[in-house]
Regions:
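Glycine/small-residue-rich loop that forms an oxyanion/phosphate-binding "nest" at active or ligand-binding sites
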Residues: 24-87
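Short, well-ordered alpha-helix to beta-strand connector turns
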Residues: 11, 59, 122-123
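Short, basic/aromatic-enriched C-terminal tail that caps enzymatic domains
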Residues: 211-227
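Active-site metal-binding motif and surrounding structural segment of the metallo-beta-lactamase
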Residues: 1-41
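Active-site neighborhood of phospho(di)ester-bond hydrolases with catalytic His/Asp-centered motifs
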Residues: 11-19, 39-42, 103-106, 126-128, ...
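Active-site environment of divalent metal-dependent phosphoester hydrolases
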Residues: 20-24, 45-47, 87-88, 110-113, ...
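Cap/insert and terminal regions of metallo-dependent hydrolase folds
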Residues: 113-215
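Core dinuclear metal-dependent hydrolase active-site scaffold
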Residues: 1-6, 25, 66-124, 224-227
Length: 227
């Protein structure tokens, strides 16, 4: 059966990137029902438990991980990587299994050479393409929120996403999923085209037509990507 039809009870653990509500909403209900282990940084865990943002949960379910230190869960090796975001101790994740590797990279206002180096030689990536700059500038958000979003601890614009991808592209990286799109300040078509333009206009040899670039839905599971 397609993975989107699999029952929730088959989920064996939870990985958290940070404590913002759009990333932990529903966590308390899920843990009270299924009691699976949760992996997150110490700062993230402390925010969740001390602020009781998820309600009453068993603190023993939480496992502390450290940025830039890998750990294993069964046959999968995971590497949490520090990111620049306005949260307590945020990370993105890189996954390794046998000869394959992928990453989930969202919620970052900027990136540095260390992060770029840590994300080389991927086979697939889900990467943030949060907003269209013009839509954000002219939209209804308060100016303070706009500053937060386009700040260095905010979110990557469509063009910034494309520029980061240009530094990650290799002969291995074929599958790109654009994610964490703003509902108010972006459209899937805008994100898709902006990222393609950044890739195609780069002096590097890679062209968007040779890549599997898709946009993740905000409301339903994306299609299965195999690599």
């Amino acid at each position: 059966a397609p993975y989107k039809d699999l029952p929730v009870k088959l989920l064996k653990l939870v990985l958290l990137t940070h404590e913002h509500s759009d990333h932990i909403k529903g966590l308390g209900v899920f843990l009270r029902k299924y009691q699976v282990p949760v992996y997150a940084t110490e700062g993230t865990i402390n925010c969740i438990l001390n602020n009781k943002t998820v309600g009453k949960v068993d603190s023993d379910l939480f496992n502390v991980i450290k940025p830039d230190r890998d750990f294993s869960i069964k046959d999968i090796e995971l590497l949490p990587l520090h990111i620049s975001h306005d949260a307590a101790d945020p990370v993105c994740y890189r996954f390794f299994e046998k000869e394959k590797s992928c990453a989930v990279v969202t919620d970052l206002g900027e990136y540095d050479d260390k992060l770029v180096s840590s994300l080389q030689n991927l086979d697939a990536v889900l990467i943030e393409s949060n907003h269209d700059v013009n839509m954000l500038q002219t939209g209804s958000y308060p100016y303070s929120l706009k500053q937060r979003i386009w700040g260095n601890k905010g979110h990557l614009s469509n063009e910034a996403c494309g520029r980061l991808l240009n530094r990650l592209l290799s002969d291995r990286l074929k599958h790109i999923l654009l994610g964490h799109l703003s509902e108010e300040n972006n459209y899937p078509e805008l994100a898709y085209q902006a990222v393609r333009n950044e890739i195609n206009f780069s002096p590097d040899k890679y062209q968007a037509d040779n890549l599997d670039i898709r946009v993740a839905s905000r409301v339903k599971p994306s299609c299965l990507v195999e690599f």
